[in-house]
């Protein structure tokens, strides 16, 4: 005997560039990759018997992504994901759940020699804005925002001392080292009344403030302080998950060449690398 215990299906890698055109050719762009997955008990028939009568074609789903993008007004991809999930639930009564996953390329306005940001010319940043919106019938949508590929580095104000040592330990303690990492993070909300774009920018500010302005005794400490700062400054954020790989840059060994090492030349090492992760949740006081 074989039993189908779960199923979902949809369309992936739907590429969208949405341009909102305001007065005086002031444009706002959303450049993103979208994946839509549908759930529903009645979809089991297509797996078990080949009956496709309830199957919403993935081509239909792809077209819907573009139609809703043009039809609806939205200020963030989080809002767009909520609208898209609402559409599928309202249109197809047998759909019980919708998951919309998006990865947005970040474009900032070009600043020209006159010091002004241009209304419709953009330069792409490295980091990615990630969004997952899960919509279920008779429940509020669950929104998870995130960031990927935010590469940061500082060349001092970081150390690593006092760690456990045993017979397999070769790492030397240091009060001063290069600290580089690629920030991957996501966060959940305790409400849907959120300025999602503002929260995204605040998250980056918290990363920059903690990373640049505090001495790091460990990647773990820096991770916690970033999440703590976000939670303290954004009351709508309920939980933060961070992943920080330690992108090592070791001092080059000049001793082999009988040259003094003045700690200004380093050798970046891509792998292996440390990987530090943590999830921090808002504490609620008990009365």
UniProtKB/Swiss-Prot annotation:
GO biological process, alphabetically ordered: purine nucleobase catabolic process; urate catabolic process
Pathways involved: Purine metabolism; urate degradation; (S)-allantoin from urate: step 1/3
A Pfam family of this chain: Uricase
Domain of life: Eukaryota
EC number: 1.7.3.3
Family affiliation: Belongs to the uricase family.
Residues annotated for urate binding in this entry: 58-59, 160, 177, 219-220, 246
Ranges spanned by the short sequence motif Microbody targeting signal, renumbered to the chain: 285-287
PANTHER family in the record: URICASE
One GO MF term attached to the UniProt entry: urate oxidase activity
Entry protein name: Uricase
């Amino acid at each position: 005997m074989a039993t189908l215990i779960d199923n979902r299906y949809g369309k992936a890698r739907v590429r969208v560039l949405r341009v909102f055109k305001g007065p005086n050719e002031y444009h706002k762009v959303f450049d993103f990759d979208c994946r839509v997955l549908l759930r529903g008990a009645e979809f089991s028939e297509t797996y078990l018997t080949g009956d496709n009568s309830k199957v919403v074609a993935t081509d239909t789903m792809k077209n819907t992504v573009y139609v809703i993008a043009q039809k609806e007004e939205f200020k963030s991809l989080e809002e767009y994901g909520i609208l898209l999930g609402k559409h599928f639930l309202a249109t197809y009564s047998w759909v019980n759940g919708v998951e919309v996953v998006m990865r947005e390329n970040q474009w900032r306005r070009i600043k020209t020699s006159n010091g002004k940001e241009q209304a419709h010319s953009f330069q792409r940043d490295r980091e990615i804005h990630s969004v997952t919106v899960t919509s279920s019938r008779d429940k509020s949508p669950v929104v998870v925002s995130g960031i990927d590929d935010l590469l940061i580095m500082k060349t001092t104000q970081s150390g690593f001392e006092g760690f456990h040592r045993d017979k397999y330990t070769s790492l030397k303690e240091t009060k001063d080292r290069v600290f580089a990492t690629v920030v991957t993070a996501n966060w959940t909300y305790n409400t849907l009344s959120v300025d999602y774009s503002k929260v995204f920018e605040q998250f980056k500010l918290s990363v920059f403030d903690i990373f640049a302005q505090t001495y790091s005794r460990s990647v773990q400490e820096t991770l916690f302080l970033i999440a703590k700062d976000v939670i303290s400054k954004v009351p709508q954020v309920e939980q933060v998950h961070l992943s920080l790989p330690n992108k090592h840059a070791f001092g080059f060994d000049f001793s082999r060449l009988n040259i003094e090492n003045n700690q200004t030349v380093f050798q970046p090492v891509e792998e292996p690398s440390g990987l530090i992760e943590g999830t921090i949740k808002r504490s609620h006081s008990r009365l």
